[in-house]
């Protein structure tokens, strides 16, 4: 509405339709609050889609309560989510390549098709000629990181219900999910105990920052702000580079990391601070020359977690990989150059076990 002529350009929203048009009132909220709210909504919706996939697969196992079946299904869901995210985030070269691959098969043929795809995603390019791949499969990248390495998982018969659940998930935009929230929602959605209690449980981003900000993040931001006050450019550049190296030298441990939301949000916060450093160092200039040069020094290898639940640990790894991908995209916008995410180059140091016994 134009406040000078309020009678013009007025948008009227009936109270019953408010939930469909809430975005029109975003101006009443802080931009950051609006963004976090959208990320929460997206991540919860994504969690529900994963829940549908999980339930549809679970019905097909001969012994759905067995440890082997549940472990296999957990790994399968993590892989499927990674593929869904990768095609929307541009990590797979062709748009909708995974959804398109799934769509072309009848349910009875989908199981071997998935097994073939997982094999390809775990095979380095030099080893692929031995697989005699179709052009379609050859187009998928090598992922690395061990996500698709275990060939011992059980994939049951795939039904039309499963294919429909995958198709529905394929229509969702996974690119903008919050890995901090989604990791916890994902684990909560598929955790049998939590499911019986009927809800999704996670620590909000706001509450995570109530812990990490006073612990170390506020001090780091203040140090960065102080560097920006340096008037001599050569000295300022030197201090910025030293500060970036300092961030890259920090190590973090969560001895009961769950689905990794504290580690993931800490990583994102440090990478955003690093991007601020790069923005100052680059000053809007395009980098030419060595295409192998990587401006990023903060790595997920600096983050360690211990988790007794193997599935939560797998989710934590995936959340950190998604966070790494999203932050790399933000860095590309800062340094104005393309950076390759795949194959995965950083180790995720999430260890499965009892922290009191390790």
Residue positions per predicted region:
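Surface-exposed acidic, glycine/proline-enriched linker/cap segments
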Residues: 232-240, 245, 279-298
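SAM-dependent nucleic-acid methyltransferase catalytic core
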Residues: 285-304, 308-358
């Amino acid at each position: 509405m134009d406040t000078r002529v309020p009678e013009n350009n007025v948008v009227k929203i009936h109270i019953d339709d408010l939930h469909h048009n809430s975005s029109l009132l975003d101006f009443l909220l802080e931009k950051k609050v609006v963004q976090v709210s959208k990320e929460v909504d997206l991540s919860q919706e994504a969690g529900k889609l994963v829940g549908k996939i999980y339930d549809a697969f679970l019905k097909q196992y001969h012994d759905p309560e067995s440890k082997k079946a549940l472990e296999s299904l957990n790994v399968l869901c993590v892989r499927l989510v990674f593929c869904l995210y990768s095609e929307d985030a541009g990590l797979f070269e062709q748009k909708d390549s995974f959804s398109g691959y799934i769509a072309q098969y009848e349910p009875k043929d989908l199981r071997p098709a998935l097994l073939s795809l997982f094999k390809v995603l775990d095979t380095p390019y030099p080893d692929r000629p031995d697989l005699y791949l179709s052009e379609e499969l050859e187009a998928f990248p090598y992922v690395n990181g061990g996500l698709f390495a275990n060939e011992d998982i059980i994939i049951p018969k795939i039904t039309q219900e499963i294919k429909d659940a995958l198709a529905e998930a394929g229509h969702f935009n996974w690119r903008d999910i919050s890995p901090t929230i989604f990791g916890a929602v994902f684990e909560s959605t598929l955790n049998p105990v939590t499911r019986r209690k009927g809800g999704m449980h996670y620590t909000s981003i706001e509450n995570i920052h109530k812990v990490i900000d006073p612990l170390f993040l506020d001090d780091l931001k203040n140090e960065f702000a102080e560097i920006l006050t340096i008037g001599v450019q050569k000295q300022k550049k030197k201090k910025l580079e030293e500060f970036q190296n300092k961030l890259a030298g920090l190590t973090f441990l969560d001895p009961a990391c769950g689905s990794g939301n504290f580690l993931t949000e800490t990583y994102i916060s440090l990478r955003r601070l690093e991007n601020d450093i790069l923005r100052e160092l680059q000053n809007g200039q395009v980098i030419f020359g060595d295409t192998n040069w990587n401006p990023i020094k903060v790595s997920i290898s600096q983050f360690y977690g211990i988790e007794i639940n193997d599935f939560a640990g797998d989710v934590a790894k995936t959340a950190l990989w998604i966070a790494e991908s999203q932050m790399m995209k933000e860095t590309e916008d800062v340094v104005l150059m393309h950076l390759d995410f795949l194959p995965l180059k950083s180790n995720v140091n999430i260890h499965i076990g009892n922290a009191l016994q390790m």
